[in-house]
From Swiss-Prot:
GO terms for biological process: thiamine diphosphate biosynthetic process. It comes from Pseudomonas entomophila (strain L48). It comes from the Bacteria. Pathway: Cofactor biosynthesis; thiamine diphosphate biosynthesis. This is Thiazole synthase. It is found in: Cytoplasm. One of its GO terms (cellular component) is cytoplasm. It catalyses: [ThiS sulfur-carrier protein]-C-terminal-Gly-aminoethanethioate + 2-iminoacetate + 1-deoxy-D-xylulose 5-phosphate = [ThiS sulfur-carrier protein]-C-terminal Gly-Gly + 2-[(2R,5Z)-2-carboxy-4-methylthiazol-5(2H)-ylidene]ethyl phosphate + 2 H2O + H(+).
Amino acid sequence: MSNVRSDKPFVLAGRTFQSRLLVGTGKYRDMEETRLATEASGAEIVTVAVRRTNLGQNAGEPNLLDVLSPEKYTILPNTAGCFDAVEAVRTCRLARELLDGYKSHENRTLVKLEVLADQKTLFPNVIETLKAAEVLVKDGFDVMVYTSDDPIIARQLAEAGCIAVMPLAGLIGTGLGICNPYNLQIILEESKVPVLVDAGVGTASDATIAMEMGCEAVLMNSAIAHAQQPVLMAEAMKHAILAGRMAYLAGRMPKKLYASASSPLEGLIK
C-alpha cells in the first residue's frame, strides 16, 4: 500500500538518535533528581540553559556536566534568557568553547536557539530569532530553533539553514498542551526539516498527540520537573513518545459519523 508509513531514523546534524524525547534540566529540586529523571526518560539529548547553568564557566560551583556527562548524553546548549540576537549568538559561542574540552562530545556545534520577546509570555521574538539564526549558521552551528507556530516563520527559519524547527505547542511552562493543532499540522506538512514540539506539554497525552501528528520528536522540561513525581513522569513520557510514534506509523482509523459494527451481521444465529 502506497500510503503505509515506514519508520525512518531520527537524525540531527548527521547523528542518529534512538530516543525521540529531548529533556531539559531546569526546575528540579536538585541535581540528583535531575539525574534520576533524565535516566528514567531514556533521553539521549539533554538541553541546558547556558546562562543559568554552570557548565564549567563558574569554577568552584557544582557543574551539571559532572552529573550528566557528555560521555553519555548529547548536551544541547540553549539560549534561554536571551532577548536579542546579539545575546543569543554570544551565548552559543560561549557554549561551544565550554564543550570543546569534551573530545567525546560529537556535536559541539549543535545548539538550540531561542530569542524571547518578553518575560510575561516568553513568546519567541521571531525577528531577532531569524537574525541570530543567519549569523549562527554562517558561523558553522547546527541550529535547532524555538519558534512560534506561524508556518511562514518556520519556513523562513528552515530556509535560513536551521536543521530543525521547534514550534511551541503552548506557552513555556504552562502545560496547556497543543493549543493550535491546525498551524502545527501545516508546519508538519510543509517543512523540509525535522519538526519538534517545544514548550507547552503538560502530560503524557500531550506528547503522544504531538507524535501522532507526525512530529519527529518532543522537547520538554516543566511537564516532568513540575510533576508530583518527576521520575515517574519521565518514564511515562518515554512510553508516551513511543506510543505516539507507533500510532503515527500505524495510521489511525478514519473517523465516521455513524456506527459500524465490529462483528459482521451475516451468519447471525437465529
